[in-house]
């Protein structure tokens, strides 16, 4: 016999969220897995002798939320605490809409912002990785790497690129960014154009990229896992994370991600002297302030300014 959680409990509220359209309509399986992982972890947390899952929702106030964040930060990391609170905000917002809670204490907690990720690919790593993908018989991943870098786009928008997005007469790729809904128009670059012949038009679908082992379009999970396998095979190194340290004070490291190609491309465009308007048109950012996180590796804007002044 299934034992249902007390209807007043946090566990019951999480069940309500998981039954909601907000949760069931999440497209990416990896996003759902991430949310489930954070919720599974936090529901088991004990503070003041009581498990979070068994607490009444009415007992979870601003003071408790602060204690919960500090507990997760101390037990795991700031990163984990921040991401857990992102999910708990969604759960409590659904509770507000369903009339099961009166306020969202997790929205009130001012969580510290972590340093922006500044991981970059080198040009040699890009060229080497593309060559390795081709040699291993996976040109689809090679072309996605080139397109992520040269188009300065997120992997999801490259992975789901269709032949119909590319205007055969003008050579311009027209698509809508999935995260922002922004309409993009980017002329196909020479390097991408030179690789399109490596990919076949299929009757089954219109996607440019298919996983060679199945002949079917990449899912988000397949793309991420297979990129990691190829990256490890090629030997992409782990790199230090700017301004982030482990509990013992040692430097925190990270693998290089496919998503880091977007930052690399935008930074390269900035170093090449592109204006804010040009960078916004290329990246899809809505305002120049959002570009600041991409201007990494050496005060690019100030250097460009002094070059234009003739001081460098």
Model regions and ranges:
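Short, polar N-cap/turn motifs at the start of nucleic acid-interacting alpha helices
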Residues: 165-172, 252-255, 272-293
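Basic/aromatic DNA-contact patch characteristic of tyrosine site-specific recombinases
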Residues: 1-8, 24, 187, 233, ...
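C-terminal catalytic core of Y-nucleophile DNA break-rejoin enzymes
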Residues: 178-197, 205-230, 257
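C-terminal secondary-structure termini that scaffold catalytic or DNA-interacting sites
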Residues: 212-215, 308-312
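Basic, Lys/Arg- and aromatic-enriched nucleic-acid-binding interface segment
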Residues: 78, 82-84, 97, 101-102, ...
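Short, basic (Lys/Arg/His-rich) helix/loop patches that form interaction surfaces
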Residues: 50, 131-141, 186, 202-205, ...
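Catalytic-site neighborhood detector that most strongly recognizes the C-terminal catalytic loop/helix
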Residues: 120, 177-181, 276, 283-308
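N-terminal core-binding DNA-recognition domain of tyrosine site-specific recombinases/integrases
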Residues: 6, 19-93, 98-100, 136-137, ...
